[in-house]
C-alpha cells in the first residue's frame, strides 16, 4: 500500500526515482508522482493511473536534479486525482512532502494551526507539509519544525521532506509504516522496501518508530525526538535483483506459480541439518513447546495458510491452536491461556493489523514468532523469533508461492515440536515434502489443462463457489480468494456440509461449483454435496487426488500425504484463477483496488 523512494547524490535523480517507483508497483497504487530539485527550485511531476503515464510526462521535460523524492499513492483520504497525488507542497512552495500512512488527528491540527491556509487537496498529507511551513515561519529551523510536527501527529506515517532552501537534505521520519535508508558512496536513498532501490545499493539502515533521520549525500544521522543521536548498523539486503524480474514469463503471478517447486526445495535445504534432520533454532522450539495454546494471527492468504497450519500443530504437535483475523483480534482480543504463544504470518512482515496485535501482546509479555518472507521487516524485528520463507521476492499482488511456503514452514515447525513433545508421527516430512515438490511440478506442467478448465467453467460466469471438507475447506477459501481478487468473479468458499444451510439457495443453472476431494474420511461426503448442487443445475468441477478419484473427475492431483494436500491442490486453483483473469483481459499482477502490502489499519 503506497510506496516511497528518495535519492540524494550526484546522478540523475528523476530516472532513479522513476525506476524505484516501478519496483514498488506491486504494492498497489492509483496515482504516482516525483519531485526533483535543482538550482531553479523543485519540479513536480504527478499523474493519476500507472507509472508509465508519469514517465511519459517526466521524460517530456528537461527538468532534472540530483535530489528528489517519489511516491505511489493508494487513496485513503480523497479520490485519486492530480491534486490528491503526492508529492504535496506547502502553499509557499518551499516544502515538498511524501507520506505513507493515515494521520488520525489531521482535522484537529488543521483547525488549530492552519485555519487561514488555503488547501489544494483533500489529503491528510497536505496538513503535514503545511504545518512544517507554518512552524518554519514561526522562526524554527527546518529540522526543529519537522520534529515538532512529528510530535503532534497521531497515527501511522512514513515521511520524506524536502526544503527548497536546503538542497542537500532529505528529512525522514516514521511510525508504524515501513521505511529504510539505503547507504552508498556519495549518495544515499530512502525506500519503503529494499527492492525499490536495489539499482543503487543493497546496504541499508533500519529506521525505528519516532525517529528523525537527516539524510545527506555523504551522511545519515538518526536521532530520537529529543535530538539524541542513535547509532545504527548497516545491513545487507539479501535480494537478487534478477529474482524481481519477470524473465520469460508474461506475468509475475505465472512466474511465481512456476517457482513453487524451487521454493519447496529451498525450504527443505534451509530447514535441514548436515545429518538430514529437520532443524529450527532451539530457542524457538523451546518457546513453542512451552506454550499451552498457540494463537495464529494473520490476514488474507496468510490467514488461510494459518488455518492449514492449525491442522499440523494440533494433529502432530498436540498443541491447541486458534487462528484469528488480525483486524478483528486487535479490537476484540479473546480470553488468553496462561502461557500463550503468538505466531504472526505475513509475506511482507509489514501487515499493519498484525503489527497492531503484536504491539499489544508485547506489552503483555507474551512470546511471539513471525513467519515472513522479508528479513528485517517490522514484524520480524519486533517479534521474539522469526522463521523465514526463503521464497524470494513475490511481486504479484495475488500471493501464490508465499502461501505454499508458509504452509511448508508451519509443517516443519509442527514436526519438530511434536518430536520435542515426544509425540511420534508416521510422517517422514522431508521425504513427503519432496513428493509434494514433484507433484507441484506435475501440475505446473499441466498448465494447459488448467487453462481449459478456466475456459470451460469460468469464462462467462459472474459467480463461482468452492466447496471442501476438513482441510479441503481451508483450501477452498484460498481458491475463492484467488479467483475473486484477480478475475473479479464473485467467488466464495464454503464447507460442504454448510451448503444446505443457506448457500444452496444461490445455485442456478450453470453455476460453477469447484469441489475438492483429497481427504479419504470425507470423500463420499463431499461427493454427496456435489450431487446436491448438480441436482439444482450447478456445473461441477471436481478436483480429487489419486487413490480417491472417481470417473468423471475434472482433474486428479498426484497422491501426497493427506495433511500436505493443500500444498498441491491449491496450485490447480492458482492456475485456474490466473487463466480466468487472462481470458477476461485483466491486469493479473495488479488487480484493481488491491495492494500487496497492507501497511495501514
Curated annotation (Swiss-Prot):
Annotated ranges, domain Glutamine amidotransferase type-2: 2-218
EC numbers on record: 2.6.1.16
Alphabetized UniProt keyword annotations: Aminotransferase, Cytoplasm, Glutamine amidotransferase, Repeat, Transferase
Listed InterPro entries: GATase_2_dom, GFAT, GFAT_N, GlmS/AgaS_SIS, GlmS/FrlB_SIS, Ntn_hydrolases_N, SIS_dom, SIS_dom_sf
Keyword flag Transport: no
GO biological process entries: carbohydrate metabolic process; fructose 6-phosphate metabolic process; protein N-linked glycosylation; UDP-N-acetylglucosamine metabolic process
Molecular function in Gene Ontology: carbohydrate derivative binding; glutamine-fructose-6-phosphate transaminase (isomerizing) activity
PANTHER family listed in its UniProt record: GLUCOSAMINE--FRUCTOSE-6-PHOSPHATE AMINOTRANSFERASE, ISOMERIZING (PTHR10937), GLUTAMINE--FRUCTOSE-6-PHOSPHATE TRANSAMINASE (ISOMERIZING) (PTHR10937:SF0)
Protein name: Glutamine--fructose-6-phosphate aminotransferase [isomerizing]
Protein's organism: Staphylococcus epidermidis (strain ATCC 35984 / DSM 28319 / BCRC 17069 / CCUG 31568 / BM 3577 / RP62A)
Gene that produces this protein: glmS
